[in-house]
């Protein structure tokens, strides 16, 4: 693992802009980050490169102040969940009428059911840059050294144009590998079952302290320098501040009564790597 924090501001700016381009959930952050800049893409890139340089210096000089950075959680629409009562009504015998996420926008219709949200990180640009640097310096090494080829989601990209491997590529690789395994079983006259499912709300069921201890042990074993240790501490300070938000606390309490349950902020680059490390034993 890197002993220090080597950052190429041009490459990193390009990667961040690629993530912003293809993930529409960053639209709230875009206005906050670049609303005071000219719409010219070159000026935005120059501004981003300058901020990357500033954040890198602040990390190395122990001047990065998470507490003075803006961090919030913004709810983004996920789906409308209809109640069991609503689903069991006689008028809902038709399967098409039972579809939870199809909404008819007519004046006589009321939306019955609970609106569900995913909470997304809204922050200063410095927080996003901090996360991008963490992925480049620490996350990449964790991805390469700790995760097997059987893990497909949220893998750190090997190229210079994006932070993570595009979702559609990762899904295609997962699908192809799964069907290849099934084909092999059939050719060998064996029986197998292919189960495809989601880990519901896995980002919302995290023991952050346990995860932090695990990452620190890996960094210590790699004998990284003080700057890398400090970078990791800053990232976990961001996680702490996010989970201290009243909105997030109330949301976690609503989900579960477990004392140590916390959230990895969706939209924070390190979360994508950390969730894979956290679920490593499950994989």
Language model features with spans:
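Non-catalytic, polymerase-adjacent accessory regions of viral genome-replication enzymes
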Residues: 1-110, 114
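Charged, glycine/proline-rich intrinsically disordered loops and linkers
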Residues: 86-111, 159-177, 239-257
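Conserved pre-motif C helix in the palm subdomain of viral-like polymerases
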Residues: 114-151, 200-203, 258-283
